[in-house]
């Protein structure tokens, strides 16, 4: 319906057949025409010469410059990496040296502390031993005094018992003779 309406619009002409002019296409495809080979070869040589000059004067130097810059940048990066490597190795060496010094210092401090504590412990031990020796000496004196007192009591008891026994057996006793006899036996 729309096609019929468009076809019937005023001012539009209907073309019913297609016409193709034959003269323009009669010779075939121009690059394959043998009569134009010479001019085509000339233009081909001129085009390649122009392209060669353009490439050799403009494009190839730019590419060479880019490659040279890239090579230089890579060399600079490698040099910088080598410098960083050396700096890193120096930093590691300094770190290891500082670590070794810190360990040595820590061991020195630990040894000094150990020695000081051992000295302090030894001093305290000697002081305690001296106090204990003093207490032992006092205890021995007290024991000796207690022993002497006990022996005096034993002597007095022994003299009294011996005197009583002699008095009961003999009827009469000499106190001084009994004391001498007890002293002789106790010593």
Curated annotation (Swiss-Prot):
Lineage: Bacteria, Pseudomonadati, Pseudomonadota, Alphaproteobacteria, Hyphomicrobiales
Gene from which the chain derives: atpF2
Keyword field: ATP synthesis, Cell inner membrane, Cell membrane, CF(0), Hydrogen ion transport, Ion transport, Membrane, Transmembrane, Transmembrane helix, Transport
Transmembrane segments: 39-61
Record's subunit section: F-type ATPases have 2 components, F(1) - the catalytic core - and F(0) - the membrane proton channel. F(1) has five subunits: alpha(3), beta(3), gamma(1), delta(1), epsilon(1). F(0) has three main subunits: a(1), b(2) and c(10-14). The alpha and beta chains form an alternating ring which encloses part of the gamma chain. F(1) is attached to F(0) by a central stalk formed by the gamma and epsilon chains, while a peripheral stalk is formed by the delta and b chains.
Provenance organism: Parvibaculum lavamentivorans (strain DS-1 / DSM 13023 / NCIMB 13966)
Matching InterPro entries: ATP_synth_b/b'su_bac/chlpt (IPR002146), ATP_synthase_B_chain (IPR050059)
Family: Belongs to the ATPase B chain family.
Claim: Transmembrane helix is one of the keywords in the record: yes
GO MF entry, a single one: proton-transporting ATP synthase activity, rotational mechanism
Record-given protein name: ATP synthase subunit b 2
Coiled-coil regions listed in the entry: none
Mode of membrane association: Single-pass membrane protein
Keyword check for Secreted: no
PANTHER family noted in UniProt: ATP SYNTHASE SUBUNIT B, ATP SYNTHASE SUBUNIT B', CHLOROPLASTIC
